[in-house]
Amino acid sequence: KLCEIISFLHSQKPTPILFLDIQPKNILIKDKRIYLVDFGNSFYVDEAQNRQMLLGTPGYAAPEQYKYENLDERADIYGIGAILYFMVTGRNGDCKGARSLEFPNEITGKYKMIVKQCMSKDREYRFLDVSTIANNLKDLTNTDIKYSVGYKPLTISLVGTSPHCGVTTIGLALASTI
């Protein structure tokens, strides 16, 4: 479903939209539906070339986002690969590229190939479009990914409206029940 959302953004006419900040905290899941939030780093493709700032989140942003290089849809493809990597490892990628990624033994070569191609340091080796990623993912079988990898990350954010209102106490109480 994430691929469908990004593909929709990339298909906008006359100018595709780049999301440029695909990371776990920007993906919400409710009732088996996926929502992409925080479009603060998003640009139309032609506007992304004239940006005055570096964009993205370390571990999820494509290497070209850390430089003032021209950006295209392949920057988001890198982010999709980083999410796929996070889903099976619970770890962020890094800027060293796909060669440095370590996978659990339960993950087969087919899934690894998809992630590594998405996260290639050189964008010329990445998938050209999101629909190709989606098709490759659909071709995976249950034996390609075992769901018993064992790491299930959980993030709970608490915000207080004033100092000393008990957020720390509530956070500790929640943590002790998990």
Functional labels for PLM-detected ranges:
Residues 4-17:
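Protein kinase catalytic-loop region centered on the HRD/HxD motif
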Residues 26-36:
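Conserved protein kinase catalytic/activation segment
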Residues 51-64:
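Conserved activation segment of eukaryotic-like protein kinases, specifically the C-terminal portion
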Residues 76:
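Conserved catalytic-loop aspartate of Hanks-type protein kinases
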Residues 106-121:
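Conserved C-terminal C-lobe helix
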Residues 150-178:
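Walker A/P-loop phosphate-binding motif and the immediately C-terminal alpha-helix
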